[in-house]
Every structure is written in structure tokens, then in C-alpha cells.
């Protein structure tokens, strides 16, 4: 594959600009996988720079499961109404709503979880490890690992994305920020399930 074909392929796969793709490929010695990783890292850095900008515009994304027993509303914010009308942004809102319907997170971010709840979970995991005969230090390390797994179950941003489990939801949003060039924030969501 020629260099131009590789650049084109990565642009289509990542949505990054041509010069960004070319630089990443050069820095990665024209190794496709390393270049994708570099683009993801650089996208995360761009996202971090934009994270403190205020996002007041946006849309309410929605999803109703085909059996009409589960529905989701998600508020996705951006900085301008121009971006709110962007197809990529609207598709992100729809994908997030579908993800929430399937994965049933309880919180948007880990910061929303009450400290008492986290500590309660941590103590349960420590006690379970101690009951298995593990020493206190090992039990605490085991508890930290299980707590991380717990966060992946209940926190939207920490969950593996339902359409691509190699990517966490927060990484998906960072990729969208890098492509769109504006801060994007999941403000809140509401999931309805018939009979629940």
C-alpha cells in the first residue's frame, strides 16, 4: 500500500485531518497500528484542552428499543448550535442513547457516585477477599481492581462502548471532540424500562 493510500485509509478510519494523519504515520514509522494509537492519544490531548470550555448548546438524543419496552433520553451538550446540527454530533447522541438503553449505567461520571457508596463497595470487596484468606494488603489491592470493574458497570463514561468494546465511551467522546473541534459533554440521561 502506498503512503497516500495509507493516509487516506487512516483518515477515513479516524476522521483526523490529513496532516495529522501524515504526522502520526511519520512518527510511527508508517506503522498503521502505532499511528492510530498516536492519533487517539493526540485526540485525547486535544479533548483535554477543550474540556474546560463551556458547552451550553446541544441536543436531546433519544432511543426507543424495537420492542418498545426500553427508552432513553440523553442531553448532549456542545459549544455552538452549528455543531448541534452536525450529523456526527447527532449520531453520537443517538449512539449514546442506544448504549445507555443496552448497558444501563447509573451515573454519567465517577464523580457523581456518592463517596459512601464507593466506600461501601470497597469494604464489601475487601471483606470478601479477607474471607478467602487473603492478607489485608492483598485484599485492598483486590478491592481496588474490583472497584474499577464496578465503575465500568455503573458509570457511562467508563463503560466499553456497545458498538466497539475496545473503546470506552469517554474515548468515543474524545474522538468526537477531536473531529469536531469543540467540547462535548454528556450532561445527563434518563432511562425508562417498562415494569422496572
Curated annotation (Swiss-Prot):
Subcellular location: Cytoplasm
Gene3D superfamilies cross-referenced by the UniProt entry: 1.10.286.20, DNA helicase RuvA subunit, C-terminal domain, Elongation factor Ts, dimerisation domain
Keyword Cytoplasm on entry: yes
Superkingdom of this protein's organism: Bacteria
Membrane-spanning ranges: none
Pfam families xref list: EF_TS
Chain segments carrying region Involved in Mg(2+) ion dislocation from EF-Tu: 80-83
Keywords of the record: Cytoplasm, Elongation factor, Protein biosynthesis
PROSITE patterns cross-referenced by the UniProt entry: EF_TS_1 (PS01126), EF_TS_2 (PS01127)
MF annotations from Gene Ontology: translation elongation factor activity
Any one GO CC term of the record: cytoplasm
Principal localisation: cytoplasm
General function of this protein: Associates with the EF-Tu.GDP complex and induces the exchange of GDP to GTP. It remains bound to the aminoacyl-tRNA.EF-Tu.GTP complex up to the GTP hydrolysis stage on the ribosome.
Family recorded in the similarity comment: Belongs to the EF-Ts family.
Subunit structure: Heterotetramer composed of two EF-Ts.EF-Tu dimer complexes.
Protein name according to UniProt: Elongation factor Ts
Organism the protein comes from: Thermus thermophilus (strain ATCC 27634 / DSM 579 / HB8)
Amino acid at each position: 500500500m502506498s503512503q497516500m493510500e495509507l493516509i487516506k485509509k487512516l483518515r477515513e478510519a479516524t476522521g483526523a485531518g490529513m496532516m495529522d494523519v501524515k504526522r502520526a504515520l511519520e512518527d510511527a514509522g508508517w506503522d498503521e497500528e502505532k499511528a492510530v494509537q498516536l492519533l487517539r492519544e493526540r485526540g485525547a490531548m486535544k479533548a483535554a484542552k477543550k474540556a474546560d470550555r463551556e458547552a451550553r448548546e446541544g441536543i436531546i438524543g433519544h432511543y426507543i428499543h424495537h420492542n418498545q419496552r426500553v427508552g432513553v433520553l440523553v442531553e448532549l451538550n456542545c459549544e455552538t448550535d452549528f455543531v448541534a446540527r452536525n450529523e456526527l454530533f447527532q449520531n453520537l447522541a443517538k449512539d449514546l442513547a442506544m448504549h445507555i438503553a443496552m448497558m444501563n449505567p447509573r451515573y454519567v461520571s465517577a464523580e457523581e457516585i456518592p463517596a459512601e457508596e464507593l466506600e461501601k463497595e470497597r469494604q464489601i470487596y475487601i471483606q470478601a477477599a479477607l474471607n478467602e484468606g487473603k492478607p489485608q494488603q492483598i485484599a485492598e489491592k483486590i478491592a481496588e481492581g474490583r472497584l474499577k470493574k464496578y465503575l465500568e458497570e455503573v458509570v457511562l463514561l467508563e463503560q466499553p462502548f456497545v458498538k466497539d468494546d475496545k473503546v470506552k465511551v469517554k474515548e468515543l467522546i474524545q474522538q468526537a471532540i477531536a473531529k469536531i473541534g469543540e467540547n462535548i459533554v454528556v450532561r445527563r440521561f434518563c432511562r425508562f424500562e417498562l415494569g422496572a
